[in-house]
Amino acid sequence: MANVQNLAFGRDVQGYNAFAPQPSNVKYKATITNGTAASVTVPSTYQVWIVSFRYFPNDVWVDVSGATATIPLSGALVASTAELNPASLELTAGTNISMVTSQTAADVSVVMWPVSYP
């Protein structure tokens, strides 16, 4: 894998971390279709990663448990390993990220930053 940009935040005028991270060079994108899951695996080059998700339209189920993401059935609330439209997650190397939508199609973007602890 090419050199990756570690998770690092810009500084504000007082020297504190700003909200936005530096750009990443570990990015994935796809257009997923109704009921067909797509997946990507977190790289193994670092142990911990911050993973950011973007979707259009917002109707994407994401599963990071190792299972394939599924669309929920109508009816009562049930336990699930999938999450609807997570913004970002801290994941470990080798985690499988599975995504599925009930829309005709959904554009997804997955951006990752490795974390180095001192």
Regions of interest found by a model, annotated:
Residues 78-94:
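Beta-sandwich interaction modules
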Residues 46-48, 54-59, 103-105:
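Short proline/glycine-enriched turn/loop motifs at strand-loop junctions of beta-rich domains
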Residues 54-73:
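Short, surface-exposed beta-strand/strand-loop-strand elements in extracellular ectodomains
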Residues 2, 28-34, 109-111:
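Gly/Pro-rich, tryptophan- and cysteine-flecked surface segments typical
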Residues 62, 104-116:
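Edge beta-strands of jelly-roll/beta-sandwich modules across compartments, strongly enriched
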Residues 22-46, 104:
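Surface-exposed ligand/attachment interfaces on beta-rich extracellular proteins
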Residues 49, 89-108:
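Noncatalytic modules at the cell exterior or secretory-pathway interfaces
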Residues 1-24, 114-118:
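Short, intrinsically disordered N-terminal pre-domain segments
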